[in-house]
Swiss-Prot record:
This is Putative endonuclease segC. SMART domains: GIYc. Probably involved in the movement of the endonuclease-encoding DNA. GO terms for molecular function: DNA binding; endonuclease activity. Its cofactor is Mg(2+). Its EC number is 3.1.-.-. Residues 7-90 form the GIY-YIG domain. It comes from Enterobacteria phage T4 (Bacteriophage T4). CDD domains: GIY-YIG_SegABCDEFG. Keywords: Endonuclease, Hydrolase, Magnesium, Nuclease. PROSITE patterns: GIY_YIG. The gene is segC.
Length: 198
């Protein structure tokens, strides 16, 4: 039986020797000498500008689990930390550093309002057209799920993507593994937050 690679979970800091500006992040790896120097846009740009030799990395703490690692990052990389001019961090710490938006209650632009009877009727008619005997949005039911010849296969034009040092075969697979909406992740890839490989 093949031996599983041991995974290390750790919190680290990277410091610019010239400016003393820091970046705090987390990393999951089976190779402690993988040369990982952060995934943030600002830290990557700083390394390009000043050169890798102008930075040093310090492992702050190792953790037993990925959750404990992300929880520790969330405690340090707070909103105040991100806003500081002495840090390279651009996003709050925690699971992948994705910002969390709360649009419940008064923060929702439609809070306290309601659609008119006429608008509700229009919405009802429009949504009923999307469903029908042929299935959702006009697709035939016989081609859904396992009946589709491409079901479970990676699209031939799919590109691999690297997120937080992990290589995923496609954006769709990454979105599913990270529990992130596909469109959101695709937008982040297009915006340059993550690298695609051909």
């Amino acid at each position: 039986m093949p031996m599983q690679d041991h995974k290390y979970f750790y919190l680290y800091s990277i410091t610019n020797k010239t400016t003393e500006k820091i970046y705090v992040g987390v990393h999951k790896t089976s190779n402690l000498d993988d040369g990982y120097m952060g995934s943030g846009v600002a830290i990557k740009n700083a390394i390009k500008k000043y050169g890798i030799d102008n930075f040093y990395k310090h492992i702050i703490k190792f953790f037993e689990s990925e959750k404990a690692m992300y929880d520790a990052e969330a405690e340090i990389v707070t909103e105040e930390f991100v806003k500081s001019k002495k840090t390279y961090n651009m996003k709050l710490g925690g699971i992948g550093g994705f910002p969390k938006h709360n649009t419940a209650g008064a923060k929702n632009g439609f809070y306290g309002k309601s659609h008119s009877r006429e608008t509700r009727l229009k919405i009802s008619i429009k949504s009923s057209r999307k469903r029908g005997p042929r299935g959702p949005r006009g697709k035939t039911l016989k081609m859904c799920g396992a009946n589709n010849p491409r079901y479970g296969k990676i699209a031939p034009n799919a590109k691999s993507v690297i997120i937080n040092g992990v290589l995923y075969k496609s954006i769709k697979i990454a979105a599913k593994a990270l529990n992130i909406n596909y469109s959101t992740l695709k937008g982040r890839v297009k915006a340059g937050y993550y690298k695609c490989q051909d």
